[in-house]
Amino acid sequence: MFTGIIESLCEIKSIDEIKKGNSKYPAEIKFSIDIGNLSKGLKIGQSIAVNGVCLTITKLNNNIAEFSVIGETVRKTCLDSIKKGERVNIERSMRASGRFDGHFVQGHVDCTGIIYDKIVFPTETKLIIKISEELKESFQYIVQKGSITIDGISLTVVDIDNNNNNSLSISLIPHTLKRTTLGIKSIGDKVNIEFDLISKYISKLLPKN
């Protein structure tokens, strides 16, 4: 379990293809990240959220953590486009004794979205994120002023447009832009999206009209 509060931006040191993909099965990959001081207390087998994707540490050598990713995870997330030298959002799993500053984040990405527009104001930046037409039903999990996870970051939904653009908007303060990947992403870039856990369970329990 995570909270969506990013601890650090860390650099991808290497990427290798474990198994080649094709039109039916995506490639399986392994990659390593220099997680710096976040490696203290971590062990092989523990989980870290990388851009919002819950991954298991398969190797740990000093500050370098390695992860193996199956094809299904690559297909459903933005991990299909990561590059060596790129910086990613990192959060270690939450301790039971820790402060809960964000919201419940599992690290199970529901879908990806595209940054459709980026509007810069003096005190904030507004991002409009578009979700593909075939995932339009996912808007049942999105609540205005409710929580959503974008690239592992706990954020608040500002507006929803599920009629014309299949989009939602979020507002980012300078601190978030400086401390996360959303400060370096541009229009057209993909992002990982995880809908609010509570919304998903409530939607599952309630009868559909």
Task: Map each language-model feature to its residues.
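Conserved loop->alpha-helix
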Residues: 1-209
